Regions:
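Glycine-rich phosphate/pyrophosphate-binding loop and the adjoining helix
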Residues: 98, 103-148
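Short, structured coil segments at secondary-structure junctions
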Residues: 12, 95-96
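Short, hinge-like loop/turn segments at secondary-structure boundaries
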Residues: 6-7, 89-93, 117-119
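General beta-strand structural signal in soluble alpha/beta enzymes
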Residues: 17-18, 74, 99-102
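Short, small-residue-biased leader/transition segments that mark boundaries at the very start
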Residues: 1-5
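Helix-loop-strand module that forms the ligand-binding subsite of alpha/beta enzymes
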Residues: 15, 22-87, 92
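Short, structured active-site "lid" loops
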Residues: 6-19
Length: 148
């Protein structure tokens, strides 16, 4: 399945770089981007981003976004979280990253797993001003007569 998703993602991209290509255009702050979303974000990747250990193009691109004050959204995939994971998330947030764990939300009336995934991705895309078609943002709760 991994190769299928990789090919689908590559088909959507203008340019694809191998992870070892630290000389790629996106490894420089002079190459403008709005930022980046790392989804899913392993704890190894989150740790490297949080601690500035730029040993691959992915981490270097995140490092560049952070130093250039561009948006970096991390969607960590681990569960349960250890103290080390939480410390690294805190370090990343202190560096300016936005942490959006792909958690289940129960307030948006999801009907399927796809709805839940799309909601988490919608939250990440909204960080860049992109509102996906059909995305339902919270519009406030309505109390029933029993709740009043």
């Amino acid at each position: 399945l991994g190769d299928v998703y990789k090919r689908q993602a590559e088909a959507l991209a203008d340019v694809c770089y191998p992870p070892e290509d630290l000389a790629a255009a996106i490894s420089s702050g002079s190459f403008y981007t709005d930022g980046m979303i790392v989804a899913p974000c392993s704890m190894k990747t989150l740790s490297a981003i949080a601690n500035g250990y730029s040993d691959s193009l992915l981490i270097r691109a995140a490092d560049v976004c952070i130093k250039e004050c561009r948006k970096v959204v991390l969607m960590p995939r681990e569960m349960p979280l250890s103290r080390i994971h939480l410390r690294n998330m805190s370090l990343a947030a202190e560096a300016g990253c936005v942490i959006i764990p792909p958690m289940l939300t129960f307030y948006n009336d999801s009907k399927s797993v796809d709805d839940m995934i799309n909601h988490a991705l919608g939250k990440a895309l909204m960080q860049f001003g992109i509102v996906p078609p059909g995305f339902q943002s919270w519009r406030g709760g309505r109390l029933s007569k029993e709740d009043k």
